């Protein structure tokens, strides 16, 4: 969706749910190479804060209406909505090691 690999080589990919607490999100994001976060919707502000606290905001993309005909992709730092549509995910890309 973003045109970039999610992971590289031996990177660890973690799938997270946005319903986790902010602290849990920060802990998980800080200890993985790449992540996909589901259940973004009403949890967007908490997820955004966790990504910022984990210092990963430059790696984050939001995909609205994932896998649908009206899908859109945007860097999370450029996303201005306070709530994401139901079929949204956040992708945190890993880096080559």
Question: Where are the model-predicted features located?
Answer:
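Class I SAM-dependent methyltransferase SAM-binding "motif I" and its flanking Rossmann-like core
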Residues: 1-28
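A contiguous loop/helix-start segment that scaffolds small-molecule binding in enzyme catalytic cores
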Residues: 31-97
């Amino acid at each position: 969706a973003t045109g970039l690999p999610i992971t590289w080589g031996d990177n660890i990919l973690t799938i997270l749910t946005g319903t986790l607490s902010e602290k849990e999100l920060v802990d998980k994001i800080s200890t993985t190479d790449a992540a996909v976060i589901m259940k973004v919707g009403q949890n967007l502000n908490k997820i955004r804060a966790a990504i910022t606290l984990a210092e990963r905001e430059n790696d984050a993309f939001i995909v609205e209406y994932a896998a649908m005909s009206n899908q859109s992709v945007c860097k999370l730092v450029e996303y201005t909505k306070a709530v994401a549509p139901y079929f949204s995910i956040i992708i945190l890309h890993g880096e080559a090691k």
